[in-house]
């Protein structure tokens, strides 16, 4: 009873701005960041008649644009983080609504339309996610910084779970209603349109957010947030420029396994193992659901082990899950990897984010955030482009081994670069 009362008290103390912000993040999680789009987009493209190489190229182009914009956007000072989020979400909304509409164009325009709308969506994602951490810090204060980021990860995971379930079920239901087989693209087109519509209220709420800092929590709550604060700069043997370059190099490699899962897991399950869309949706959803308690446990895990160790251990864990996929072509093995890698991604992402932000002065946080997002985009773009051709030329096992080796290399580099950081 005491525990329930304490949890209730903590949620009552969450500032209104954070509740509104979390609603926006929930809409993103339900639709594009782990939800409907994550389950159905690649399957939709397959049913339009394209193969893994085009899917890889399509994802690569969007992610490369995301990567190219992330670092410059992190250095922008003319616009506030709030304005950048509004611009970003507007582009995401337009791109998501536009992509499935291309099915009604002449077939000769399909590929170009898919690429153009995917690029617009990733332009929006770059504007948005580069400035999420700085924006959270502008609407919170002190101990709320890392707590809000932890709540953000949990919200994305829970919303992604719900969106994954909905995305897995809708094509079958719509196919029955429209008397169309699930091999037809139309039962996938309408859920993608629905995902875009769900973002409209989030965009409205985002415009009403104000960058007003909340009061410092009382001393009694100071121990509740156990994440190290980025304002406490570490002693480094590197310049800020060197830190940026190191973060980019390490993260591009470390993110490879996650990129393989995010881009090709549903393609492998559908095209390689002939798994039903319902089961693909369930596996994706469960990976997000398991991520909720993991995200909420971040403060405790960081206080127990530290961000540096968590980055290394979580990355090695993803490598250990990917290797069996190369040798055992079974949906249970692929499902375990999808769930394990997807669920732990919030812990890996947040621990790396807080660790990297703590390496630089406060005025350089947006730059570091941009460098981190750019490296994720570059890593995913590289995996998407190379992965599509690896599958075509050598099969899925070659892709899985490729991802595991590069991620392991990134972990070794992270250990070498930062093991002596105090």
Residue ranges with predicted function:
Residues 2-18, 211-249:
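Juxtamembrane intracellular "pre-TM" segments in multi-pass secondary transporters
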Residues 5-68, 243-276, 280-283:
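Helix-loop boundary and gating motifs at the non-cytosolic
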Residues 57-75, 285-297:
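Central cavity-lining transmembrane alpha-helices of secondary-active solute carriers
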Residues 69-82, 294-307, 391:
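Helix-to-loop junctions at the C-terminal end of transmembrane segments
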Residues 90-108, 317-329:
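C-terminal ends and interior cores of transmembrane alpha-helices
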Residues 95, 108-128, 252, 333-347:
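Hydrophobic core of transmembrane alpha-helices in multi-pass small-molecule transporters
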Residues 127-140, 347-360:
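Intracellular juxtamembrane helix-capping segments at the cytosolic ends
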Residues 196-219, 413-418:
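C-terminal membrane-cytosol helix-exit motif in multi-pass small-molecule transporters
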């Amino acid at each position: 009873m005491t525990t329930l009362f304490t949890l209730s008290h903590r949620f009552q103390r969450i500032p209104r701005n954070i509740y509104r912000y979390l609603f926006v993040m929930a809409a993103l999680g339900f639709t594009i960041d782990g939800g409907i789009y994550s389950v159905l987009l690649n399957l939709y493209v397959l049913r339009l008649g394209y193969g893994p190489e085009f899917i890889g190229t399509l994802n690569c182009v969007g992610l490369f644009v995301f990567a190219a914009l992330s670092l410059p956007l992190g250095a922008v000072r003319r616009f506030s983080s709030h304005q950048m989020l509004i611009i970003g979400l507007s582009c995401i909304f337009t791109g998501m609504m536009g992509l499935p509409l291309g099915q009604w164009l002449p077939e000769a325009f399909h590929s170009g339309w898919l690429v153009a709308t995917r690029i617009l969506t990733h332009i929006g994602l770059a504007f948005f996610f580069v400035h999420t951490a700085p924006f959270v810090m502008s609407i919170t204060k002190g101990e709320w910084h890392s707590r809000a980021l932890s709540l953000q990860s949990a919200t994305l995971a829970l919303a992604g779970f719900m969106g994954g379930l909905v995305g897995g079920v809708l094509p079958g239901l719509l196919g029955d209603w429209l008397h169309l087989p699930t091999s037809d693209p139309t039962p996938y087109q309408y859920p993608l349109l629905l995902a875009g519509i769900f973002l409209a209220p989030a965009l409205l709420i985002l415009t009403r957010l104000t960058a007003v800092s909340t009061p410092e929590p009382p001393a009694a709550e100071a121990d509740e947030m156990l994440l190290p604060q980025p304002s406490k700069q570490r002693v480094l043997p590197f310049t800020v420029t060197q830190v940026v370059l190191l973060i980019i190099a390490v993260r591009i490699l470390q993110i490879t396994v996650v990129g393989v899962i995010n881009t090709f897991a549903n393609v492998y399950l559908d095209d390689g193992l002939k798994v039903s869309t319902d089961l693909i949706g369930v596996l994706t959803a469960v990976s997000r659901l398991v991520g909720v308690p993991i995200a909420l446990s971040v403060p405790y895990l960081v206080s127990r082990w530290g961000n540096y160790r968590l980055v290394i251990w979580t990355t090695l864990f993803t490598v250990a899950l990917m290797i069996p996929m190369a040798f055992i072509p079974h949906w249970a093995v692929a499902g375990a990897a999808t769930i394990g890698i997807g669920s732990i991604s919030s812990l890996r992402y947040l621990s790396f984010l807080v660790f990297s932000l703590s390496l630089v002065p406060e005025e350089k946080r947006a730059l570091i955030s941009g460098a981190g997002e750019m490296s994720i985009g570059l890593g995913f773009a590289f995996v998407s482009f190379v992965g599509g051709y690896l599958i075509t030329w050598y099969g899925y096992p070659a892709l899985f081994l490729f991802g595991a080796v590069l991620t392991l290399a990134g972990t070794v580099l992270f250990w070498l670069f930062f093991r002596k950081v105090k």
